[in-house]
Amino acid sequence: MNYLVLILVSLVSIYFLFIKNQDRKKKINSKIPGPKGFLFGNLIELARTKKNLHLKYLEWFEKYGPVFRVSIGSLETVVLTGYPILREAFIDNSDTFTSRFQRENARSINGYKGLINSNGDYHKNLKSVILSEMTATKIKKMESHINQESKRLCELLDQHAKQGTPFTMNKYLNLFSINIILRFLFGVNYPYTELDDGSSSIIQVIQQFLKLVSQPSITTYFPILSPFMNDRSKEFYDIHKLLSNHIINLIERYKDSKQHQQQEQEPIDGATEPTVTILDKLLIEVENNRITQNALISICIDVLIAGTDTVGQTLSFAIVALVNNAEIQEKLSRNIIDSMEKGDNHYSYSKYRNGIPYLALVVKEVFRMYPAGILGLPHMTSEDCEIQGHKIAKGTQIIQNIYSTHRSESFWPNPNNFIPERHIQNDVSKSVHFAVGTRNCMGMSLSEAEVHTAMAELFGNFKFTNPSNIPLNDQGTFSVALNCPDFFVKIERRN
């Protein structure tokens, strides 16, 4: 009986402490403009537009300004829009805004020991490990893998060009980016045939996990309920377990291959030189007890999720935009072909990144119109602060409104038109594709190399056309990344 009383008292105490903390945050944030909420704040309104959440935030930005407040259940949220505001928060006041907002349902998955949702010194150590493999020198070494994957993709597209029938490209572009990250992590890649074999391969599992991980969670919006319920679906945990098992097998395979490589002094998987991946340094962290084996699995999953869907979706949107703007596609193709030296059959990012000016402009415009992380990853204020005269309470969730920063007339003329020439002035401060601050995208150098290389190979070698008279749909939907609708194109080889 005493135990029951103790449990009851503890629960009541937790409840009142939570309510008191929420009241404090609401009181401090109350002067910030934003949509009025009734039952459950703005949760119901947001739930109705969940696939177009970015459009709702654009609407609210136009109405309430660059700093506005949203109540999502019991979750106090402030949304920041525009580079000047984002800079003030995430650069000028970085100590206050650096922390990642930690969703309650992530605790049961990795105890906040992954790459995405960790904080403090633990995250700083992980970041230093990851960034040590993202230097210009390391990215240059990755070029051969990116070029190899681009070649495999072009060989596949050659088959479709010969057939001359419309087909959907999304899945191929997603696997292109998945394979590069798998090579980056584990030194492996997978054939494009695995997209259609209906198996439970890692490719299939990653794609299923991407769909499930973005599903809404009750405990995110009502954290007080987390001790009493686990609102992740059984399917989510089953897929997460499958993905974890694939990661474990890849890690063991990599360790065995590395051992064999050291014994035989041969490269892994037939590479021309010894393969070094980020996994080597992460394994050292495990050996030194700075991260656990379970954390290693979570970190690998985070890198996969962060690096695959984003690039794949970006390339899909790039093709859609250039099919809908045929004259821009032709200009880009000519610029690529004319800029490459005679005898160069394939694009080299380190050689041509500054040598094909129109390609650079087109990539910037793709990043602007179709930012992968449309609302970024949520942050949390570590103390009370003030931005543009608005007081924001400690513990408030902070959203970087990247989509509105890129798609509002407040920052760009004709924001919904695809105009690469707008970037000739090179005002990069307006673009926040990779987020702002010390926790911006760690893989942006690799992503840029992937996107530049893929677009140079695709548009330098193929002409993409729309088999329909209706323009391709470029209205993305909200998910882990801005999702491009499936689209059909016809392609033909350029001479």
UniProtKB/Swiss-Prot annotation:
Gene3D superfamilies: Cytochrome P450. It holds the Pfam family p450. Its cofactor is heme. Keywords: Heme, Iron, Membrane, Metal-binding, Monooxygenase, Oxidoreductase, Transmembrane, Transmembrane helix. It is a single-pass membrane protein. It is an enzyme of class 1 (oxidoreductase). Heme binds at residue 441. The chain crosses the membrane at residues 1-21. Its EC number is 1.14.-.-. It comes from the Eukaryota. It is found in: Membrane. Belongs to the cytochrome P450 family. This is Probable cytochrome P450 513C1. It comes from Dictyostelium discoideum (Social amoeba).
